[in-house]
């Protein structure tokens, strides 16, 4: 009872002292209750946020608002409004929601995803852009993508029941090799892939605005952990440890390899070499070294997460719409022929495959409710005033499923981007906005292309059947925990199209024999969870 009284009194004091903001000029929304605001209007557990907020569009219009403990949350269901607020007004809308839990307690404010817009953010983004943010920069890693996508086919051939794991391993293999020159374990789970996936899971959860009460009531941090409701402290410590290990373990691996002169050229080794040549000695500026480590750590979340979700959606779509797979295979057969797998050099000659990349990003977007921005100043949009400090949340799923923009939007239909329909490219909405657009999007786009093209060329994908031989209809549903979504687990059947395809897949064993994994070279106490 005492704890309840303390919480209520503290909440009231905090609300009256810091969050007594007027609604004048705010976008319309449900009337808030005293003190707690619209807390009852927040998405319930188990309901996808993008679906929950859709009803606000119909009731309150394309730009609406709610507030919790005086904190405004602006809900955007209009593409033009989103691009005005995030692109044209990027000087005022590039902040991130202040996250006491995810930022200060977990430490995720060290990395791009949760950093506030400022000097550190600009330095980090410049580093990433310089290495991977251009077509030429992304193209440097095509050899890695070529090998890892081919190995993905081989894993899928030899062990088709673990396709989802193979998708994650392919994405992790590309990013970790490109970022650190690290080779994943070829035939068993890789501890570094496992570690970074835990980090991404944490980021996905903490970036959801209004997820943790301690973000609104920071004084809860000082309540004894033994009392009810304080379990967030142990969770924060675990995620901080995972983040710190994700930053340090692979970075130290690169330094050790460079000391021996056996490093593979990568994002980290290139930056360290450039700094050494510039400085003429082995002493690194502490700030620059921290920038390298922290930007490297976010690479996986910046590219691999979208790649994994998108490829999983693609596989699901091939079962639900088998005619699409047949049409794509016909294009591959006509353009490439039966004697080789498609490569990056074929992309401009594969318009239908390119459209499949776009449609896979649109159909089940990896971040359907976008990543929240924060208004760093008052923003005026029409007759609305979005006050400084507001959280801005774009419903990306709606932008990509608005029937006024996309014909029959629930259908997976690559033809929508081709003549004569020419529906809008989803690219401008599925990678973020403004100064916070995903810096690894070009690398991720190339990974998605090469995997889709080669799966289409080599495999048939079908619905699974039960023990009685009845077809199992897969569910087209999202996971609901965190900002990052993927299809819920589904049954499937995948098999090589023919004997020639088996030969093409197995050729990688001769062309690129399995590397010995580098896991044993990592500091083991950092990667054992």
From Swiss-Prot:
Its EC number is 1.-.-.-. It catalyses: (-)-longiborneol + reduced [NADPH--hemoprotein reductase] + O2 = culmorin + oxidized [NADPH--hemoprotein reductase] + H2O + H(+). The keyword Transferase does not apply. Signal peptide: none annotated. InterPro entries: Cyt_P450, Cyt_P450_CS, Cyt_P450_E_grp-I, Cyt_P450_sf, Cytochrome_P450_fung. Pathway: Mycotoxin biosynthesis. One of its GO terms (molecular function) is monooxygenase activity. GO terms for cellular component: membrane. It is an enzyme of class 1 (oxidoreductase). It is a single-pass membrane protein. The chain crosses the membrane at residues 2-19. Belongs to the cytochrome P450 family. PANTHER family: P450, PUTATIVE (EUROFUNG)-RELATED, P450, PUTATIVE (EUROFUNG)-RELATED-RELATED. Cytochrome P450 monooxygenase involved in the biosynthesis of culmorin, a tricyclic sesquiterpene diol reported to have antifungal activity and some phytotoxicity to wheat coleoptile tissue, contributing to Fusarium head blight disease. The terpene cyclase CLM1 is responsible for the cyclization of farnesyl diphosphate into the intermediate longiborneol. This is Cytochrome P450 monooxygenase CLM2.
